[in-house]
Amino acid sequence: ISRFPFGGVHLISRSPEYHKTTAEQDITISRSCHSIAEIIQYKSKCNYLFLSPIYDSISKEGYGAAFSRIDLKQAADKGIIDSKVLALGGVSLECIPQLRSMGFGGAAVLGALWQAKEPTRYLKALMEA
């Protein structure tokens, strides 16, 4: 990755672990996770982790939430969900206060933004939330 002007690398469940070389210490590593166990496993090796699906998908029919609110609260209480963990899956503007209260460091919004009647206004509202 150091041969290209990338700011980082995003890993998925099928990706091998990525070990930074000496020249790559400033790059950001993020990873998609689909279980609390994966968050625990990769947290010390990544700058950011995306946990999904938190809510029922907005854009993928039949793709439901994988975690109960109780499970997420317990993970937050144990320090597993924190500022390094971003919520993904079914996230909309209305979810932001709940995600913040559960300890997520942020959220990735896809379907709600894609389906917004006024995406620019919706994005601005998200950024101000």
Which functions belong to the PLM regions below?
Residues Q25-D26, S59, D82-S83:
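Short, contiguous strand/loop micro-motifs
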Residues Y18-H19, K73-A76:
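A short alpha-helix capping/helix-coil boundary motif
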Residues G64-K73:
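Charged helix-capping and loop-helix junction motifs
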Residues T28-K43, N47-K60:
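Internal catalytic-core helix/loop-beta-alpha segment
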Residues L11-T21, F50-Y63, I96-A129:
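Glycine-rich phosphate-binding active-site loops on the catalytic face of alpha/beta enzymes
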Residues I1-C33:
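Glycine/small-residue-rich loop that forms an oxyanion/phosphate-binding "nest" at active or ligand-binding sites
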Residues I29, A66, L86-A87:
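Residue-level marker of alpha-helix boundaries and capping positions
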Residues I1-G7, C33-K45, A75-I81, V85-L86, ...:
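Catalytic cores of alpha/beta
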